[in-house]
Amino acid sequence: MNLNKWLLGIGICSLGFGLYMVFVKPHVDDYYLDHENAQAIENYQSKNVSAIPLDTPTDKSKMIGYIEIKDAHIKAPVYPGAATEKQLKHGLSLVEEDESVDEQNVSIAGHKAEGRHLQFADLYKVHMGSKVEFHTKGETRRYEIVSHRKVNPTNTSVLEEKVGKSQLTLITCDDYNPNKNKWMTRSIYVAKAV
């Protein structure tokens, strides 16, 4: 009899823990991530402009700015590249190791997670003409979304410099295939300086 009660107690605890992990924990994680991002952005904004580094920091944990896209409800810190799995845990990241915010084509990568409010998860909500603000180096750079396309994950042509106006290239994973447990394409959003 005691064994049955003990097993029932373990079963109920296991079920409760499983339900918490599936239904509650992602929301708690999102809450804390949003709070950390908001605090990082507030700290960045409160810095004296002269205290904001003009060069891309070599310390990968130091923000280089933050991006704001109102149509997609995105306001997230941006960190130096390269956009490795480890670096993307901090937040959005410049794609390449030696990339600078002063390049003609600044490429920024972010995670997309189904059912979670994380980095570029809501980027799909933008449309042609959506406004993008990149706050960096004590200034606000304004852009407008001009194109969206999907590419093969091995396509690096989206990172190339092009003659003309400055642009942001926003990159996130797309078309998740649960059978292969991988993202099949990359969504590329290009925003031109206005």
Where are these regions (language model features)?
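Solvent-exposed, non-transmembrane regions of membrane-associated and secreted proteins
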Residues: 9-194
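Positively charged n-region of N-terminal signal peptides that target proteins for export
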Residues: 1-5
